[in-house]
Amino acid sequence: MNHFSKKVSVSLMALVMVAMTASAGTNAAKSTKTSGVNWNPVMDAIIQVESEGNPNAVSGKSVGAMQITPILVKDCNDILKKQKSKKRYTMADRYSVSKSKEMFLIIQKHYNPENDVEKAIRLWNGGVKYSQRSTNSYYKKVLAQMK
């Protein structure tokens, strides 16, 4: 497959994923939905790419199934504080898959209100100021896991 065909295939796959997640619905767990999007397929793919599903994975300052950093925990807590929520996450919560998924949803709701699947994946890998180029490989790996 040539380079152009690969790009078209990835783009089409991304569009299909957006359509599928946007229409996924009523059977999805309430805690994994924001504005009608079922984030479970994205989160599950990220978990496979980040840690192969290992909730005890450690790589530098990143830990848990979703490889959460202390900076992300602080960011989630800052967002919750601004929302006047009393809920806060601890560093130990990074080892909990369910709490890691909650943090993912907080980040997406705050930084990705349009619920763009591609942005969600790139944002998770590269942070708020991610670049397209630096997150390309990661984005492709997550999409491949979502097949």
Residue ranges and their predicted role:
Residues 54-55, 111:
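Short helix-to-loop capping/linker segments positioned immediately adjacent to catalytic or ligand/cofactor-binding
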Residues 38-54, 68, 104, 119-127:
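Short, functionally critical alpha-helical segments immediately adjacent to catalytic or ligand/cofactor-binding
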Residues 1-41, 140, 144-147:
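N-terminal secretory targeting signals
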Residues 42, 61-64, 138:
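Residues that flank catalytic or metal-binding motifs in active/ligand-binding sites
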